[in-house]
């Protein structure tokens, strides 16, 4: 472990000396002369035309005479090269060591390696100035990377294979931002106090990620330091919240406060300005509308993250919100008359787990699983007040600000001049409560018109939609309702009531039907009830192996009844008639007269011819009255007599059989083993 001494610029907390303070210093002081020379060197020439941002300095970030960005007077190209050399060596060296559990002392270990310009037996030669590269808590950060599914080779390929890209609009923090060419990681320079606070935060951060990796908090993948020329430049590697391949039409930095929370005129002149709270409330008074499941998942994630930040006494953090307007991009493409560059190079999903906004609130990805790739690029589907389809990319940023003495003093001073509840700097408990209330009530709102449907990942997961184009996404009207009475299986087929659900089977299956067969084929029920399910032909039904059998009884030549076992024709259904026990039932005729049905104990079933086209219709329970009654007469034998029942005419009458004991028209008689008591069933196949 090494003890670091902060450089003289960092010890001042302000980070840099302004030009006015430098010119007012005493001319005889050596420090004042040094600062004057530095400022004069960075000042633009009088005869030349200054470039954009030339000669201006914000914190440690500045621009040299050639127009290149500098950080602590180190050029951006030098800093990028040193970062890639250092990370390439440390990560490669760490991957050769065996993995082990994270120990408490691992959070405070600092490894250091010297990189001379001429090279050494461990480091390659380079054309930069000699520098020392430090890695903070390498074992702990290796665990974090594994937790998010980032392999060492992928980490090295993203950071070291191609040059880093500097962001042109870094913000007002005075930091320099780099993004990898694959949009996977962001590299940000941090202050000494911020790096120190992150080191203290690591044990609690480790515990929080173990409990729940789905969070909107920054995902830290590494903390490093480049030491050169007496300067310590500390950088942190994080997840990229706003991918460059997705065009952001709006960008907001939201804190939940109102004091000076409006974008300046200078900021609005930028190509992609960063708007603030008052701008959001003015431009989007209706907020961002989400469906109920998405809103619930987002609110729970925000609530959990706010509690974590409050427990660490963190404040002054923000919600970075990027809005991609799908409808606006389609209008822009139609106006241009050609496809944009986004179509030429199809976006590739991020490799890290839980790195997108959609995964952070929804989950669904586990360690080692492949992430579903769709054209939403991890954005959260939403709708604005005008009904336009949006994709939201969100994340909580700037969490390395603790409520120290300087922040307490800042809040006290601002509270004396303005309303203390409106300023951004506040105690952590109040800040977290105000932040959560603003996000859950003003920014994000639940819309009753937007409904989600349970997907294959279970209830609460977002609706999985395969878009047709790079900017296609589901709209509000295309999302089916979640509270539907009709159940859908994975194939989208509707499930009808099965034989076991009715409780009174009339047909005995040869073999127990599978789950798919049970949901795709229904079985006949009793005629006394109002439901009549028409079986559908299943792929397992064949003429050689029918699914159902039935018994028939007929009179032989000697006058004795005979039983026969037949394979059930799939073009027929068997209906069983069950009179009420002990009560005579009168079936009215057309003129109102009736015939008394014999008492209980009589029961039979008949074969009813069904048209083949009717098998594709809905169950007869959805119809009623005479229109749904079978048109074919039903013959049955009860109490020593033959009876004929006409469902269409609702008439029951006794008939006289022929000398052979069978009906005159040659119809077959169906035997029901549940109610026929003259002869017990003896065939073993009837019990299958």
Curated annotation (Swiss-Prot):
UniProt-listed SMART domains: PIPKc
Enzyme class per UniProt: transferase
Entry EC number(s): 2.7.1.68
Gene Ontology BP term (one): chemotaxis
Lipid biosynthesis in keyword set: no
Places the protein is found: Cell membrane; Endomembrane system; Cytoplasm; Cell junction, Focal adhesion
Annotated Gene Ontology cellular component terms: adherens junction; cytosol; endosome membrane; focal adhesion; glutamatergic synapse; phagocytic cup; plasma membrane; postsynaptic density
Keyword ATP-binding appears in the UniProt entry: yes
Post-translational modification Asymmetric dimethylarginine, affected residues: 459
Short name of one Pfam family: PIP5K
Sequence positions bearing Phosphoserine: 554, 672, 682, 686
N6-acetyllysine modifications at: 265, 268
Record PTM Phosphothreonine, positions in chain: 688
Cross-referenced Gene3D superfamilies: 2-Layer Sandwich, Phosphatidylinositol Phosphate Kinase II Beta
Comp. bias (Low complexity): 525-534, 602-623
Ranges where the PIPK domain occurs: 75-443
One Gene Ontology MF term: ATP binding
Modified residues (Phosphotyrosine): 635, 671
Reaction equations catalysed: a 1,2-diacyl-sn-glycero-3-phospho-(1D-myo-inositol 4-phosphate) + ATP = a 1,2-diacyl-sn-glycero-3-phospho-(1D-myo-inositol-4,5-bisphosphate) + ADP + H(+); 1-octadecanoyl-2-(5Z,8Z,11Z,14Z)-eicosatetraenoyl-sn-glycero-3-phospho-1D-myo-inositol 4-phosphate + ATP = 1-octadecanoyl-2-(5Z,8Z,11Z,14Z)-eicosatetraenoyl-sn-glycero-3-phospho-1D-myo-inositol 4,5-bisphosphate + ADP + H(+); 1-octadecanoyl-2-(9Z)-octadecenoyl-sn-glycero-3-phospho-1D-myo-inositol 4-phosphate + ATP = 1-octadecanoyl-2-(9Z)-octadecenoyl-sn-glycero-3-phospho-1D-myo-inositol 4,5-bisphosphate + ADP + H(+); 1-octadecanoyl-2-(9Z)-octadecenoyl-sn-glycero-3-phospho-1D-myo-inositol + ATP = 1-octadecanoyl-2-(9Z)-octadecenoyl-sn-glycero-3-phospho-1D-myo-inositol 5-phosphate + ADP + H(+)
Post-translational note: Phosphorylation on Ser-672 negatively regulates binding to TLN2 and is strongly stimulated in mitosis. Phosphorylation on Tyr-671 is necessary for targeting to focal adhesions. Phosphorylation on Ser-672 and Tyr-671 are mutually exclusive. Phosphorylated by SYK and CSK. Tyrosine phosphorylation is enhanced by PTK2 signaling. Phosphorylated at Tyr-635 upon EGF stimulation. Acetylation at Lys-265 and Lys-268 seems to decrease lipid kinase activity. Deacetylation of these sites by SIRT1 positively regulates the exocytosis of TSH-containing granules from pituitary cells.
InterPro entries linked: PInositol-4-P-4/5-kinase_C_sf, PInositol-4-P-4/5-kinase_core, PInositol-4-P-5-kinase_N, PInositol-4/5-P-5/4-kinase
Keywords: Acetylation, ATP-binding, Cell adhesion, Cell junction, Cell membrane, Cell projection, Chemotaxis, Cytoplasm, Endocytosis, Exocytosis, Kinase, Lipid metabolism, Membrane, Methylation, Nucleotide-binding, Phagocytosis, Phosphoprotein, Transferase
Region feature (Disordered): 48-71, 525-565, 592-629
Subunit (UniProt): Interacts with TLN1. Interacts with TLN2; interaction stimulates 1-phosphatidylinositol-4-phosphate 5-kinase activity. May compete with beta-integrins for the same binding site on TLN1 and TLN2. Interacts with ARF6; interaction stimulates 1-phosphatidylinositol-4-phosphate 5-kinase activity. Interacts with AP2B1. Interacts with AP2M1; phosphorylation of PIP5K1C by CSK disrupts the interaction; clathrin competes with PIP5K1C. Interacts with CDH1. Interacts with CSK. Interacts with PLCG1; interaction is abolished upon EGF stimulation.
Purpose of the protein: Catalyzes the phosphorylation of phosphatidylinositol 4-phosphate (PtdIns(4)P/PI4P) to form phosphatidylinositol 4,5-bisphosphate (PtdIns(4,5)P2/PIP2), a lipid second messenger that regulates several cellular processes such as signal transduction, vesicle trafficking, actin cytoskeleton dynamics, cell adhesion, and cell motility. PtdIns(4,5)P2 can directly act as a second messenger or can be utilized as a precursor to generate other second messengers: inositol 1,4,5-trisphosphate (IP3), diacylglycerol (DAG) or phosphatidylinositol-3,4,5-trisphosphate (PtdIns(3,4,5)P3/PIP3).
Protein name: Phosphatidylinositol 4-phosphate 5-kinase type-1 gamma
């Amino acid at each position: 472990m090494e003890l670091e001494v902060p450089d003289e610029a960092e010890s001042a907390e302000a980070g840099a000396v302004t030009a006015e303070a430098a010119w007012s210093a005493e001319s005889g002081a050596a420090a004042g002369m040094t600062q004057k020379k530095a400022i004069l060197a960075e000042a633009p020439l009088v005869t030349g035309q200054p470039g954009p941002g030339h000669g201006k300095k914000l914190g440690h970030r500045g621009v040299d005479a050639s127009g290149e960005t500098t950080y602590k007077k180190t050029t951006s190209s030098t800093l990028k090269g040193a970062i890639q050399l250092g990370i390439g060596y440390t990560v490669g060296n760490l991957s050769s060591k065996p993995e082990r559990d994270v120990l408490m002392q691992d959070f405070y270990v600092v490894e250091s390696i010297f990189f001379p310009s001429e090279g050494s037996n461990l480091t390659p030669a380079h054309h930069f100035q000699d520098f020392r590269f430090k890695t903070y808590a390498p074992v702990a950060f290796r665990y974090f990377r594994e937790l998010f599914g980032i392999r060492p080779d992928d980490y090295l390929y993203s950071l070291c294979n191609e040059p880093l890209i500097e962001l042109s609009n870094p913000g007002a923090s005075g930091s320099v931002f780099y993004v990898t060419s694959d949009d996977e990681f962001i590299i940000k320079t941090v202050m000494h106090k911020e790096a120190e606070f992150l080191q203290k935060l690591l044990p609690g951060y480790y515990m929080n990620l173990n409990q729940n990796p789905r969070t909107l908090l920054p995902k830290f993948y590494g903390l490093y330091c480049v030491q050169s020329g007496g300067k310590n430049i500390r950088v942190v590697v994080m997840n990229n919240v706003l991918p460059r391949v997705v065009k952001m039409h709006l960008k907001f930095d939201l804190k939940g406060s109102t004091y000076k929370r409006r974008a300046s005129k200078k900021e609005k002149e930028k190509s992609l300005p960063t708007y603030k709270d008052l701008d959001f409330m003015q431009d989007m008074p209706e907020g961002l509308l989400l469906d109920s499941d998405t809103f619930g998942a987002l609110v729970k994630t925000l609530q959990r993250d706010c509690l974590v930040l409050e427990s660490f006494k963190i404040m002054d953090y923000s919600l970075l919100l990027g809005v991609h307007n799908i409808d606006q991009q389609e209008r822009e493409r139609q106006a241009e008359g050609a496809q944009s560059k986004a179509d030429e190079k199809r976006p590739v999903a991020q490799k890290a787990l839980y790195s997108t906004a959609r995964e952070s609130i929804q989950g669904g990805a586990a360690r080692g699983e492949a992430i579903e790739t769709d054209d939403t690029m991890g954005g959260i589907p939403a709708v604005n007040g005008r009904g336009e389809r949006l994709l939201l990319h969100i994340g909580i940023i700037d969490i390395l600000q603790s409520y120290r003495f300087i922040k307490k003093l800042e809040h006290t001073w601002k509270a004396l001049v303005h309303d203390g509840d409106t300023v951004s700097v506040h105690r952590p408990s109040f800040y977290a409560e105000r932040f959560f209330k603003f996000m859950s009530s003003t920014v994000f709102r639940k819309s009753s018109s937007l409904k989600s449907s349970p997907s294959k990942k279970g209830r609460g997961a977002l609706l999985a939609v395969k878009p047709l184009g790079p900017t296609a996404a589901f709209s509000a009207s295309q999302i089916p309702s979640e509270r539907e009475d009709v159940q859908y299986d994975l194939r989208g087929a509707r499930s009808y009531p099965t034989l076991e659900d009715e409780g009174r089977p009339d047909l005995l299956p040869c073999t127990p039907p599978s789950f798919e067969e049970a949901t795709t084929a229904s079985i006949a029920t009793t005629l006394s009830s109002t439901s009549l399910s028409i079986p559908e032909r299943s792929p397992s039904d064949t003429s050689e192996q029918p699914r159902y059998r039935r018994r028939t009884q007929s009179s032989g030549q000697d006058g004795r009844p005979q039983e026969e076992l037949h394979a059930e024709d799939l073009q027929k259904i068997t209906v069983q008639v069950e009179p009420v026990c002990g009560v005579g039932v009168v079936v009215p005729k057309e003129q109102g007269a009736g015939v008394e049905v014999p008492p209980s104990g009589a029961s039979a079933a008949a074969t009813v011819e069904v048209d083949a086209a009717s098998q594709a219709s809905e169950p007869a329970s959805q119809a009623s009255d005479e229109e749904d009654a079978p048109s074919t007469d039903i013959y049955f034998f009860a109490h020593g007599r033959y009876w004929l029942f006409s469902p269409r005419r609702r008439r029951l009458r006794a008939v006289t059989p022929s000398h052979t004991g069978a009906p005159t028209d040659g119809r077959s008689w169906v035997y029901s083993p549940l109610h026929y008591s003259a002869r017990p069933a003896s065939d073993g196949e009837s019990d299958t």
